[in-house]
Regions:
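Low-complexity, compositionally biased segments
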Residues: 8, 18, 34, 75, ...
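Glycine-rich loops and low-complexity Gly/Arg-rich segments
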Residues: 84-88, 93-94, 171-174, 227-231, ...
Length: 268
């Protein structure tokens, strides 16, 4: 059995027994153990998700293969409440945003594209940066880990979803994109990751210093940019370029501990 053959399409078609065999092989390769294979709630698009424990830390099995990541801004139809928020909050606030929300999204979201990725293990929980970003890759490598590249992060977060957010098209009503509370952003994603759930606390660096996903450090909320733009940092394809620039600059050297990284383990 080769984990190189574990594609997302194949995972979709597998029964629980086959999923278990692949997950147990992944666990064997990293000297870990399969702690659970569970059915995924309906609406997530996947039948099962597998979590493996290695050295006291939990990792989700992320199938690879040819997958689609990014977001098709041109095809995006904002929901009525999103359009209203943009017009009456974001534009009316005088922040200088583009008149068309599609232009605003195109500035920060990566384009729709097809990529080929390996199957990997990815930490269920991201970890706080232990040092300035430039030193993190070497620190991870010393433990047999690495950072995800942007394509891998988007695939792991969206799990094949084509919507703006990993949970769907809408900004959840009556909840905030930060702090305690309930909502789809607080639930594990289809692969079992706790990811992109708090604009203040869940921002993650990647192997590319120009891409930070899962949050903006609260910039949009603090700025009062409006509901749509306050949720937008949690969009699966949002590379948060301003946040990435901040983290990579001199100010980021003093605040790196407020950001995260998600360890990845390669599989044979």
């Amino acid at each position: 059995m080769s984990l190189a053959d574990l594609t997302l399409a194949r995972w979709h078609a597998m029964d629980p027994a086959a999923c278990t065999r692949y997950a147990e092989e992944a666990a064997r390769q990293v000297d870990g153990r399969l702690v659970r294979l569970e059915a995924v709630p309906q609406g997530t698009g996947l039948p099962h998700r597998a979590v493996i424990e290695r050295k006291g830390e939990q990792y989700a099995l992320i199938p690879g293969g040819e997958v689609t990541v990014g977001f098709d801004v041109e095809a995006w139809q904002p929901l009525p409440e999103q359009l209203l928020s943009y017009q009456e909050e974001s534009l009316a606030g005088g922040f200088g945003f583009e008149a068309d929300p599609r232009d605003c999204l195109a500035r920060v979201l990566t384009p729709r594209r097809t990529v080929t990725l390996p199957a990997v293990l990815m930490a269920v929980e991201a970890v706080r940066l232990p040092e300035v970003p430039a030193q993190v890759p070497a620190l991870f490598a010393g433990r047999g880990l690495r950072l995800p590249c942007p394509d891998e992060w988007e695939h792991a977060c969206g799990a094949g979803a084509t919507t703006l957010f990993r949970w769907g098209a809408a900004c959840p009503a009556d909840v905030s994109p930060y702090g305690a509370g309930e909502g789809p952003h607080r639930l594990p994603n289809a692969f079992g990751l706790r990811i992109a759930y708090d604009v203040y606390d869940s921002a993650e660096m990647t192997s590319d210093s120009g891409f930070v996903y899962g949050g903006d450090g609260g910039e949009a909320v603090c700025g009062g940019y409006g509901t749509l733009l306050e949720w937008l940092p949690l969009a699966t394809a949002n590379r948060n370029p301003a946040t990435a620039e901040f983290l990579g600059g001199p100010e980021g050297e003093d605040m790196f501990a407020d950001f995260n990284a998600r360890p990845v383990i390669d599989l044979g």
